[in-house]
Regions:
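Small-residue-rich transmembrane alpha-helices
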Residues: 256-259, 293-325, 338-364, 390-403, ...
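Interfacial "coupling" helices/loops that link adjacent transmembrane helices in transporter permeases
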Residues: 18, 253-296, 688, 700-743
């Protein structure tokens, strides 16, 4: 033990003499751990919220009985089932508005509520009495209370004017959910003696068969391990995880570079330790212990940084998930102990992986070879060939996944294999470019410039790989986002056909508004729409009703149509299908779909496929009159108006005055479009932030590589100084070499980035969301990214070059006295 401590003390003395290397190693581990753990913290927070929502009083984690058409059903069925021995409990669900904030209202019957329902509160006798006895209680999560700007104990009014029972905080509830006694819910939702579903508890005996009690009025839905929300958001979280992994590996490149150089510089020290009697096993064990200790320290710091990164990004992530999927995520972090343990574990594992090559080389290197300055460079050519072969293998894997893969994971696998192969083959490409430059060089200094750049390549290769990956991801993601932005704006122009949008509070007000508008000369057309929900092949589908108007024929974003598609839509036996639903269910033009409706099955011929970006649900578009015939309960509250631009403000003011409509119930096209674009931009704010983080880490990788190489470069630079080149000129040459190699890397990153963009658009987006975007290239944006890469490289190279320009001549003279 004493000998091991002495060996550890000797090894640690290296870091006292090379503080910059020590900082480099810690920075790499901290950056890798921080970005990875930050992304994982966000994902964990979101998944915790999904779990809370899924387990709240009969989410998908609970078996239940529902009506086949997903409508409410009479409370009498609950009584019949209880008498027949079924352990069921009724739930009524609806939506209410409080101060313009829409929330879910759940009515439960606490006495019969199954004990195994996920987030059901355990109400004691006193609590139960307070919950059901007048005035009752409204259970609410604390974040919902804050969102409603209410205090505990208040009884807020809903949009109909009725008041909720006093609010009481229930911590385990999901956000934006209010829970009341079912009798209260029936009154507030104007659904007397109606139930949305019946939760099924554990039976004590054998109940009567379901069909013998209720016939075909109800059907059983089994619990599901994964919620619809989780399935919808998997792609979003996988995207975040991919960014986190990329940043993690870029950070490990820094660690690998620092550890590799530290091992090379410590080889004489290792030789001395071996000569003094320390065994190879002891030395390598102590090296691992040292590395693990450093990884633990860096991991703790990285976790703290990851927490702050997650806290900074979480509001944008929550906004993205809310806008894209309707998912409610708390805006404050609450992390479990396993997150901290996983962060420490990933830091230690990453450090060991990054140092594995150096440890293996140190074990296999003969003792006497440790004194040779070029011992490691002798194997560089062999490693270059091996890397190129591995790159070809990675490209082959990418092609196989592209051809045979069908899942989202396969899509990301194509990206990972492609980028891994490109990173591995980069040194070989750069070596060829520098060799060509060397062959065409004229003059001794220029020849040395190219030859020395090739020699320096081995020390910079990992940092350049990190730069290549960061740039390629930046090019790919930014191209995808810009393409999406351009396509989205064009799509909005088609979908937002009307000039003014009105949402009546109920059907009666809708009729009154239409009658009033008919007498207005400034209204050119009244476009009434409607929406209904249905289950189609086990999936929730939104039915959108459109009026028969020329404006929709001109603007609706159809991708593919059958002949006379709009004409066939009018009678009500045809429909357009959204692109994502078409892909999900493999439905094409000419197919017939059967939609369950209250009056029976509704058969629809598919006559068109249209883009429906950002909608997590599948959608079928039908004629609005046919929709109301098939779904009589469809709210007829959605009204679009065609109005001359100069008449819009006056019409909106008149509607607000006549019917008391607030800004949430009436808006012009420009306002709706601006809000949609704002949500779109915020959705990709996280992506932009992670892009910047990744590029920043790549810049740090280049900086640390140059700093760690600075001392080992002196034997190559001292002879040039001795023959008359000044130190500032040497620094300029070194800077030019670094920028040249960075430029070559950036130029190689452009086609790789465009390939990444194509994979994101044609593979990942299609698998994740169901829609495919047109591919656009933005040359000015590519030039801008190359310039940013060069600027980052300039900043990274500046400090080492300034140190070289100001170096004391004595340090250069020492090179001739000692080759090391």
């Amino acid at each position: 033990m004493k000998r091991a401590l002495w060996v550890l003390a000797v090894l640690l003395s290296h870091w006292r003499r090379h503080k910059m290397q020590f900082a480099t190693l810690l920075i790499g581990l901290i950056a890798a751990t921080a970005l990875w753990s930050g992304v994982q913290a966000i994902n964990q927070q979101a998944r915790n919220a999904y779990d809370r929502a899924a387990a709240t009083f009969g989410g998908v984690r609970t078996a239940m009985l529902v009506a086949p058409n997903a409508a409410t059903f009479p409370q009498e069925l609950f009584i019949k089932l209880r008498r027949a021995g079924w352990p069921v409990s009724p739930v009524l669900e609806g939506r209410v508005q409080i101060n313009g904030h829409s929330v879910r209202l759940l009515g439960i019957e606490p006495v019969t509520l199954p004990v195994d329902v996920g987030n059901a509160p355990r109400l004691g006798a006193t609590d139960l009495s307070s919950f059901v006895a007048p005035p009752g209680q409204t259970l609410v999560a604390r974040e919902t209370l804050r969102g409603l700007q209410q205090a505990e104990g208040t009884a807020p009014a809903i949009s109909s004017g009725a008041r909720l029972p006093p609010l009481r905080v229930q911590p385990q509830l999901a956000p934006d959910v209010l829970v009341v006694d079912i009798g209260v819910a029936q009154r507030l939702l104007s659904k007397p003696d109606q139930v949305s579903r019946l939760l099924i508890g554990k039976p004590r005996g054998k109940p009567a068969p379901l069909a013998s009690v209720v016939g075909e009025q109800l059907e059983r839905v089994e619990p599901n391990a994964e919620t619809e929300l989780e399935r919808l958001t998997d792609s979003f979280h996988l995207n975040l995880t991919a960014f986190g992994l990329l940043s993690f590996f870029v950070g490990l490149f820094i660690v690998n570079s620092a550890v590799g150089l530290a091992f090379e510089q410590r080889l004489p020290m290792l030789r001395t330790l071996r000569a003094c009697g320390a065994s190879a096993r002891l030395v390598n064990t102590v090296l691992v212990v040292e590395l693990v200790a450093l990884a633990l320290v860096a991991g703790l710091i990285g976790l703290a940084c990851g927490y702050f990164i997650a806290a900074a990004l979480l509001p944008d992530v929550a906004a993205s998930l809310r806008g894209l999927y309707g998912a409610q995520i708390p805006g404050q972090l609450s992390l479990r102990p396993e997150w901290w343990l996983a962060g420490i574990g990933i830091s230690v594992a990453g450090a060991l992986v990054a140092a594995a090559t150096s440890l293996i080389k140190a074990i296999r290197m003969p003792v006497l070879a440790t004194g040779q300055p070029g011992a490691w460079q002798q194997r560089q050519r062999r490693w270059l060939i091996l890397q190129s072969c591995a790159a070809c293998g990675a490209f082959a894997v990418a092609l196989l996944l592209l051809h045979y893969g069908q899942s989202l994971i396969a899509g990301f696998g194509v990206l990972a294999a492609l980028m891994f192969g490109a990173a591995l083959i980069l040194p070989a490409f750069l070596d060829i470019i520098l060799l060509v430059g060397q062959r065409f060089a004229r003059g001794p200094l220029v020849l040395w410039f190219w030859a020395d750049s090739r020699q320096q390549l081995s020390g910079l290769s990992l940092a350049l790989m990190a730069l290549l990956l960061a740039l390629a991801v930046n090019v790919g993601v930014s191209t995808m986002v810009e393409t999406f932005s351009r396509t989205f704006i064009g799509w909005l122009n088609g979908r937002l056909a009307a000039d003014v949008y009105v949402s009546a509070s109920d059907n009666a007000q809708g009729v009154a508004i239409r009658n009033w508008l008919k007498d207005r000369s400034d209204v050119q057309a009244i476009l009434s729409g409607g929406r209904a929900e249905a289950q189609f092949q086990g999936q929730p589908v939104e039915l959108l009703g459109l009026p028969d108007h020329a404006l929709y024929r001109e603007r609706w974003p159809l991708i593919e149509t059958a002949p006379r598609a709009w004409t066939r839509l009018v009678p009500g036996n045809a429909a357009f299908i959204s692109e994502q639903l078409s892909r999900r269910l493999n439905v094409q033009i000419g197919d017939v779909v059967e939609v369950p409706a209250p009056g029976g099955t509704w058969e629809l011929d598919i006559v068109g496929i249209y883009a429906d970006y950002g909608n997590p649900k599948g959608q079928l578009t039908v004629n609005v009159a046919a929709l109301i015939r098939q779904f009589p309960q469809t709210p007829q509250t959605r009204i679009g108006l065609i109005v001359a631009r100069e008449n819009i403000p006056g019409l909106i003011a008149a509607l607000q005055k006549q019917f008391g409509l607030d800004d949430r119930r009436i808006a012009d096209q420009a306002t709706v479009k601006a809000e949609s674009i704002r949500i779109f931009n915020r959705t990709f704010a996280v992506t932009s932030a992670l892009n910047a983080f990744t590029l920043g880490v790549a810049g740090i990788a280049l900086l640390t590589s140059l700093l760690t190489l600075a001392n080992s470069r002196l034997p190559q630079l001292a002879p040039l100084w001795a023959i008359g080149l000044t130190r500032p000129r040497l620094a300029t040459i070194e800077l030019t070499k670094t920028l040249s190699v960075a430029l070559f890397t950036a130029l190689l990153a452009v086609p790789l980035g465009l390939l990444v963009a194509w994979c994101l658009i044609a593979i990942v987006n299609v698998k994740a969301f169901g829609w495919r975007l047109p591919f656009h290239v933005f040359p000015l944006h590519l030039v801008e990214l190359v310039a940013v890469a060069l600027f980052a490289s300039l900043l990274a190279a500046l400090l080492p070059m300034v140190r070289l320009a100001r170096m004391q001549p004595a340090n250069l003279v020492k090179v001739f006295a000692n080759e090391r």
